[in-house]
């Protein structure tokens, strides 16, 4: 099962048709196929459930998709060495300096020769679509990776009206108040790791194994710095780092959560996958609901 390690959350701004047949048909048009000899990269959908034919896995109103990206890796120094050799040989043979366009043509030829022998880097990115709350969760640590996967989904569906989930109250202001006023919600526990920034972004303090209510930390906050990242534990169910943009990084589910379905036999892979997906999405949905409520609800957009 794809236990999310990060969660970049997006809000759908209008209802879409998530019927399984239509979704499967749309995703199949952008299915992942391995790189051929002349391909530098391939990007498309793969089946979430091993051995299945569907590109979407759904339970109730929750849908799981998995994007697969394959990139051929040719070290830059290998290309440069081969290209330099070819340029030197040709310039010596023709007794002249090659033009820029000629060098580019040689480089393209070098890459095409090296491609069939290049190693592949494979990367999978999971997307969970909560069609009940109109939220999309992307298991990505960077906005670039998340946006790439959303672009693939948009291409598959023809339209994907989404915006990053935003709160009415700025997370950095709320997290700063938590520390200064020692007023953490009962369902959260701080984990002695944080990042503080000045309003002008010029000063950054990163701390680990540091009591957040220490005089040193409080003085930084009283001097005008804000909490922009904060490591937290939620209900003893999972730990994560909350960022000032509302994203959740370094998600780690507690053993007692991950082991809840251990009574299901390993041979029943599909049943365990199903149960774990229900479990994970249920936990993250509750956490998201807690955060939205505590941060004053979702931000109204004009």
UniProtKB/Swiss-Prot annotation:
Keyword Nucleotide-binding appears in the UniProt entry: no
State the InterPro entries in the record. Answer: RdgC (IPR007476)
Report the main location listed first in the record: cytoplasm
- Any Pfam family the entry gives: RdgC
GO biological process terms, semicolon-separated: DNA recombination; regulation of DNA recombination
| Record keywords | Cytoplasm, DNA recombination
| GO molecular function terms attached to this record | double-stranded DNA binding
Q: Please give the GO cellular component terms listed in this UniProt entry.
A: bacterial nucleoid; cytoplasm
Entry's localization field: Cytoplasm, Nucleoid
Q: Which family does it belong to?
A: Belongs to the RdgC family.
Functional description taken from the UniProt entry: May be involved in recombination.
Q: What is this protein called?
A: Recombination-associated protein RdgC
Q: Please name the source species.
A: Mannheimia succiniciproducens (strain KCTC 0769BP / MBEL55E)
Query: Which gene underlies this protein?
Result: rdgC
